[in-house]
């Protein structure tokens, strides 16, 4: 599939399935804990500065945000998880919204699960990966902020993440930096393969 990634726009924000776009376009969901770099990932992948709002305040994305890419596919940004300053009730509401989307959306082709290369995956990261494996949803692990770690230590950090996740070697694992754009081509290859 040929994609003009510059031709991208935020389409709509949805709280439940009655608000989802009603068409057949394939979707790739982006999941990860708050401040893992999802907005930076979207902006880098689409060669845009501010298409997805980056925020110093974790937990800003509270709806499913659908991004139209060249009228051929969509990214769906789901609320960041694991942010403590959101009420338990609010977190449960997000959880139900995310679960409904991931388990019922026929357009969904795969989930890009973002983890921070600098840190061991959180319990939420592990739970998300196990959830995706349980529902047999194709998953691409993208380890963000690779530029914050010397290249010589990438393998060590990658191994630690894979071990904690009990990583399935048949899944894609991509080291990514929104600063240097390392991993961008590999991420697009993995995504397009799932469509």
Swiss-Prot record:
CDD domains: YihA_EngB. Pfam families: MMR_HSR1 (PF01926). Disulfide bonds: none annotated. Keywords: Cell cycle, Cell division, GTP-binding, Magnesium, Metal-binding, Nucleotide-binding, Septation. GTP binds at residues 32-39, 59-63, 77-80, 144-147, 176-178. Residues 24-195 form the EngB-type G domain. PROSITE patterns: G_ENGB (PS51706). It comes from the Bacteria. Its cofactor is Mg(2+). Mg(2+) binds at residues 39, 61. GO terms for molecular function: GTP binding; metal ion binding. GO terms for cellular component: cytosol. GO terms for biological process: division septum assembly. NCBIfam families: GTPase_YsxC. PANTHER family: ENGB-TYPE G DOMAIN-CONTAINING PROTEIN (PTHR11649:SF13), MSS1/TRME-RELATED GTP-BINDING PROTEIN (PTHR11649). Belongs to the TRAFAC class TrmE-Era-EngA-EngB-Septin-like GTPase superfamily. EngB GTPase family. Necessary for normal cell division and for the maintenance of normal septation. This is Probable GTP-binding protein EngB. It comes from Streptococcus pneumoniae (strain JJA).
